[in-house]
Swiss-Prot record:
Entries under InterPro entries matching the protein: HD, HD_metazoa, Homeobox_CS, Homeodomain-like_sf, MNX1/Ceh-12
Tissue expression: Expressed in VB motor neurons in the ventral nerve cord.
Function: Transcription factor. Plays a role, downstream from homeobox protein unc-4 and Wnt signaling, in specifying synaptic inputs to A-class motor neurons. Involved in patterning of the synaptic outputs of the postmitotic DA class cholinergic motor neurons.
Compartment(s): Nucleus
Cross-referenced Pfam families: Homeodomain
A GO biological process held by the record: neuron fate specification
Gene Ontology terms, MF aspect: DNA binding; DNA-binding transcription factor activity, RNA polymerase II-specific
Record-given protein name: Homeobox protein ceh-12
Protein keywords: Developmental protein, DNA-binding, Homeobox, Nucleus
Disrupted gene: phenotype observed: Causes abnormal ectopic expression of homeobox protein vab-7 in VB motor neurons. Suppresses the inability to move backward in an unc-4 mutant background. In an unc-4 mutant background, expression of innexin unc-7 in puncta adjacent to VA motor neurons is significantly reduced for posterior neurons, probably as a result of miswiring of gap junctions.
Entry keyword annotation includes DNA-binding: yes
CDD domains according to UniProt: homeodomain
GO cellular component: nucleus
Amino acid sequence: MMFSSIDSLLKISTSSQNEDQKLESHPSPPSQIPNYSTSCSEELMKMAAKAAQFAAQASLENSFSSSTSPTSTVTPLSAYTSLVQPVLPLIYDHLALTYSVNAWQAWGKMRRPRTAFSSEQLVQLEKQFSDNRYLSRPRRYQLAQQLSLSETQIKIWFQNRRMKNKRCPSSTPIQSTSSS
């Protein structure tokens, strides 16, 4: 990351020192359980900000130490991994809940509740089915709006009604055809 001026470097280092002093005045125990009420993205944003401050401070310290000594100091990897550790329990716990041993058994048993159509809705659906066994998309949309149902519910009802008609043809409503 390139900085536009030395002033911006100094602002970052002084702001990180101020934040370090604030953190030192309110020490938190190292075994503190992470707050699960905040979202994962918020945690990642906080960690990215801490990492940027840490990297800026480390590069600033390295630039000063390289001017005083011929060898540059290398920051150990453990200093960076300590920034990542608070998020790992969030991710692990989420995955543990999602992919637990018995989750697949419970997932197979979960079903949407059966839609209970009102008598008015059934009369209208049966009337439409007697006119035409297949609905066009615009007609399905219009019928869904009229009956306060979703298009998917209308589509599934028509599929089920066609299968019922196929199994027992006597269930088809008699179409009244007038001869003139």
